[in-house]
């Protein structure tokens, strides 16, 4: 059954320059209202970041689509997400690749995201409670790394876990944040500024 709210969102994303049909299809089929509180459900398909508790947010749909598209994912891509949050970005990735690894520093958010993903029959995701600055070394190296919080500097551990030819999308900065796309070429990392963004900070350590 068609969802007019989802239809409207996808039309907006297309008009905003999103071209990857796999990203559009993934976001069209996912019930975004399942990833926000009941009080926020009426805004679920608006192009806004929404609070999810613990000082964190679910990113605006355009940014989710843009960051996912920039990774140029293949079905077999080994993907690491830093910042599980609500699980929405995780779910979008899981529609496109065979398996997603996701690290969340706030235990309550990790468990809530796991519950949501299970309710939606999304099982090709492994989540971990831990420090996102450290990545998930035992599951790497990764073809793609997506970071959903802003780092003051690019975490060295994440660069080292990126496969040769792999791509990372990460917001960097404090008050002024730039969305960077980084591609590894041997021992070199080629960085491109995509656009200005605003994310919650990538905090070191983990929180029970």
UniProtKB/Swiss-Prot annotation:
GO terms for cellular component: cytoplasm. Pfam families: PCMT. It comes from the Bacteria. Its EC number is 2.1.1.77. GO terms for molecular function: protein-L-isoaspartate (D-aspartate) O-methyltransferase activity. GO terms for biological process: methylation; protein modification process; protein repair. CDD domains: AdoMet_MTases. It is found in: Cytoplasm. The active site is at 59. Signal peptide: none annotated. NCBIfam families: pimt, PRK00312.1. Belongs to the methyltransferase superfamily. L-isoaspartyl/D-aspartyl protein methyltransferase family. Catalyzes the methyl esterification of L-isoaspartyl residues in peptides and proteins that result from spontaneous decomposition of normal L-aspartyl and L-asparaginyl residues. It plays a role in the repair and/or degradation of damaged proteins. This is Protein-L-isoaspartate O-methyltransferase. The lineage of its organism: Bacteria, Pseudomonadati, Pseudomonadota, Gammaproteobacteria, Vibrionales.
């Amino acid at each position: 059954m068609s969802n007019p709210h989802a239809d409207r969102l996808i039309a907006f994303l297309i008009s905003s320059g999103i071209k990857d049909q796999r990203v559009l299809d993934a976001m069209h089929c996912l019930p975004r209202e399942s990833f926000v509180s009941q009080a926020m459900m009426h805004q679920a398909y608006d192009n806004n970041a929404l609070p999810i508790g613990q000082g964190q947010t679910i990113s605006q749909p355009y940014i989710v689509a843009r960051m996912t598209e920039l990774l140029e994912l293949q079905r077999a891509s080994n993907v690491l997400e830093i910042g599980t949050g609500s699980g929405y970005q995780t779910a979008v990735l899981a529609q496109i690749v065979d398996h997603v690894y996701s690290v969340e520093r706030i235990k309550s958010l990790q468990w809530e995201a796991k519950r949501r993903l299970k309710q939606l029959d999304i099982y090709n995701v492994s989540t971990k409670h831990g420090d996102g600055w450290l990545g998930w070394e035992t599951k790497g190296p990764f073809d793609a790394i997506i970071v959903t919080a802003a780092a003051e500097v690019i975490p060295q551990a994440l660069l080292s876990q990126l496969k040769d030819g792999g791509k990372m999308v990460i917001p960097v900065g404090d008050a002024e944040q730039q969305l960077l796309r980084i591609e590894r070429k041997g021992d070199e990392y080629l960085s491109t500024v995509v656009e200005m963004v605003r994310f919650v900070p990538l905090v070191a350590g983990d929180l029970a």
